[in-house]
Structure formats: structure tokens, C-alpha cells
């Protein structure tokens, strides 16, 4: 078995868990390859002394990898897909962050997790991905034109609203007067979209949700659409530029830009340990069914 490991940051209190993970993988004779910057942080903090093979970019990974560990929070998983893209390498998130909707493995469960992986006591959840195209083409977006959670447009350098004209499959839908607009996948429905009043969508649902950010017209509600819908956006406002975000990546676009958002031709595979499920994660993370009044 061969695995990749990626982390954005190295926190002192996470050092022992990183060491525990590497030791557990070594015990099972699993080949480990670590992202170069994260490996440098591990060596700098003297977590381990031995050398590991490393990778730096998407081009250095291939289908020979059986698994990809993301160490951090949900933001780290979102950055992990920059390395995975369409390689179909399953991602498993070890949560050393806070909420952890995607990074569902707690750091205290590492040894048990490795045992489950070795004995194949896990399932794969296929998650849809969004891709964005712009006319004219944006160099800022480049090859990173995809998102696991959401693609959003936001105002820039102004406190005034922007107007987002929206078409679905070339049919006019609405002009949103708002701070911005979110197009989220089912995976992203528990993130930015949820905080703006959007619904929770079960991951395997073939749907997307369009959620306005602080709309001027309170009748502008989130809209759930089929995931094979082509979404076209045109932005106007007092400023000549606006922001577009693809998960954690941001690009500045001019108001002359036309955006097209579609479901990508590939999916991201997420590892789910038995008997974990999305519904259990909802109950744990959102405290559903718990009475905290006393």
C-alpha cells in the first residue's frame, strides 16, 4: 500500500499525533510520501528523524497511490484536492482543526483508523466537484478552476451591493442584488452556503444550491437545482472588479467577464470509516437532538 500525506500547518500540540500516524503506517509496511513543505515542518520540529520521499505538485502524484491523508481541518482537505484533482485517490481527513465536517477522523483515533484501513473496513463516498470557465479566460484562475465545496462571487473594494444576473441552461433566472452569490455542491452545503441560510443536502444527491449572500430583496431565497445545469453569471456594480472564490482560492475578475459554472467531469473520493455516516456527522457537528439548556 502507498499513501500520500499533506498538511498546511504544524501545530505543536499536533506533533505527537503526526508521529503516531507515521509510526502506525511504518508498522504496517505502508509506503509513505509526504508533501515537501509539510515534511520540512515535520523535520524542523524534530517530530521524526528518518527521511521520507516527498512530492510538491499534482504532476508528481499518480494512480499508484491507494490513499491520501489530509492532516488539519476542512480547509486542509479543500487544499488537498489541488494535488488529487482527477486522479481518483481517496482522501481521508484527520481532524486537528475545529469543526471538521470533511475531516471526520479525530486525532485520538489514528491507530484504530490505520487498522480499519489495512483491514478494508471503510467505504468510499463520491463527492461532486464544480468547475468554472470565464470569457475572457482568466490567468488568475488557470488550472485551479474547480471546487469541492462552492464557487462564489463577492463584491470587492466596496460596501455597496453588486448585481448578479443569473441564467440556468441559457434561460434567465434572476438578477440578485446582494453582497454576492454562492453555488454549492452537496458537500459544500454544510459550509458557506449553510451560514447564508442555504439547506443541508445529503452528499449523494445529484443537486446544486444557489444561495444569495445578504440579498437586498428578502424574497431571493436559496434555490436547489439539478447538478447537470449550466449556470451563467454576469456581475455589475459601482466597482469595475469583483472577487471569485473556488473554495479557498480567490481570483479578481472584471465586470466584463462572463462566468460559467458546471459540474466537473470527475469526482473526489472521500473515505468513510464504518459505521460513520453523513447523518452521524450532522448530529455530532451540529449538535442535533442535544439539549444544551442545562
List each model region and its residues:
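ATP/NTP phosphate-donor binding region
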Residues: 1-67, 108-123, 134-145
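Short glycine/serine/threonine-rich phosphate/pyrophosphate-binding segments
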Residues: 14-15, 75-80, 190-195
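Short gly/pro/ser/thr-enriched loop/turn and capping motifs at secondary-structure boundaries
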Residues: 41, 97-102, 200-201, 216-218
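Gly/Ser-rich helix-loop-strand patches that form or flank binding pockets
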Residues: 79, 83-96, 101
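Catalytic core of DAGKc-family lipid kinases
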Residues: 98-179
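ATP/nucleoside-binding phosphotransfer catalytic cores, i.e., glycine-rich phosphate-binding loops
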Residues: 153, 169-172, 220-294
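Short aromatic-centered micro-motifs
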Residues: 166, 188, 244
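Gly/Ser/Thr-rich active-site loops/lids in small-molecule metabolic enzymes
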Residues: 174-219
Amino acid at each position: 500500500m502507498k499513501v500520500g500525506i499533506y498538511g498546511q500547518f504544524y501545530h505543536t500540540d499536533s506533533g505527537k499525533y503526526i508521529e503516531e500516524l507515521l509510526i502506525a503506517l511504518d508498522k504496517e509496511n505502508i509506503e509513505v510520501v509526504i508533501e515537501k513543505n509539510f515534511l520540512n515542518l515535520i523535520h524542523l520540529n524534530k517530530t521524526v528523524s528518518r527521511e521520507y520521499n516527498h512530492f510538491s505538485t499534482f504532476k508528481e502524484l499518480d494512480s499508484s497511490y491507494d490513499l491520501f491523508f489530509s492532516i488539519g481541518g476542512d480547509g486542509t482537505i479543500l487544499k488537498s484536492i489541488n494535488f488529487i484533482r482527477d486522479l481518483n485517490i481517496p482522501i481521508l481527513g484527520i481532524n486537528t482543526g475545529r469543526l471538521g465536517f470533511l475531516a471526520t477522523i479525530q486525532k485520538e483515533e489514528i491507530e484504530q483508523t490505520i487498522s480499519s484501513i489495512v483491514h478494508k473496513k471503510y467505504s468510499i463516498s463520491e463527492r461532486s466537484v464544480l468547475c468554472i470557465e470565464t470569457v475572457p479566460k482568466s490567468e488568475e484562475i488557470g488550472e485551479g478552476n474547480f471546487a469541492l465545496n462552492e464557487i462564489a462571487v463577492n463584491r470587492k473594494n466596496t460596501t455597496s451591493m453588486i448585481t448578479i444576473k443569473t441564467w440556468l441552461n441559457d434561460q434567465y433566472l434572476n438578477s440578485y442584488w446582494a453582497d454576492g452569490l454562492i453555488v454549492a455542491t452537496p458537500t459544500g452545503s454544510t459550509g458557506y452556503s449553510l451560514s447564508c441560510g442555504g439547506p443541508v443536502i445529503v452528499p449523494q444527491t445529484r443537486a446544486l444550491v444557489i444561495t444569495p449572500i445578504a440579498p437586498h430583496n428578502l424574497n431571493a431565497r436559496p434555490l436547489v437545482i439539478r447538478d447537470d445545469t449550466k449556470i451563467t453569471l454576469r456581475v455589475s456594480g459601482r466597482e469595475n472588479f469583483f472577487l471569485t472564490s473556488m473554495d479557498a482560492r480567490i481570483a479578481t475578475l472584471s465586470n466584463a467577464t462572463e462566468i460559467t459554472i458546471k459540474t466537473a467531469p470527475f469526482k473526489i473520493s472521500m473515505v468513510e470509516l464504518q459505521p460513520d455516516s453523513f447523518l452521524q456527522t450532522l448530529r455530532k457537528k451540529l449538535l442535533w437532538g442535544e439539549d444544551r439548556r442545562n
